[in-house]
Amino acid sequence: MKNNILISIIVPAYNVEQWIERCLDSIRNQTYRNLEIIVIDDGSTDKTPEILESYSQKEERIIVVHQENSGLAIVREKGIAMAKGDYVGFVDGDDVIESNMYERLLNNAIKYHADISHCGIKYCFYDGRVKMHWGTGDIKVFDRDTGIKELLSAEIIEPSLCNKLYKRELLYNSCLDVTIVNYEDLLRNFVLFQRAEKTIYEDFCPYQYWRRENSMSNNAELTKQF
């Protein structure tokens, strides 16, 4: 049964005291309930660690890890190593997801027998602007070669890890270089799309990527179009 499938969600968190509560609330309130929420505090110096401990006390699905500041790639590697889910997703600690995101991604992965299920991103700015691609509701299924071409063209497939649901086994040893800062998402996705026999894309935008300075994943590939 679908409800027996466990999804692990990896949340990197670094100095996100202003945003982490709304992020975790949006994950906790997912319509798909069988979640493992792994939050890795990457050496935060604000109140992020205390907030995370508070959430772990009231939500048994939340697992909190504290570590010295190591960078986004290493945080994700630790989360992948800890994950027990059949599928794995990523949410940045200052972002928000709509309540049905993982249920729809999982439904598509099952229906189309896909290794990666993904969707669009809504880019939210603190001055009130919102930008998103398309949002037509269309569904597109890609084989390996077509998926890689679409990823590199960036016309349909966003390079981010955060709008996708991956079969867990794809993710092992998928980081080319943990010292890379810019384009880490794109490079890792290039490896993952090479490993995936089939990917499924639904054109809806439930992932709210909030643009702010000093975000852990504030990479050039996510801003070039704006």
Q: Residue ranges of each PLM-predicted region?
A:
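Nucleotide-sugar donor-binding/catalytic module of glycosyltransferases
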Residues: 1-226
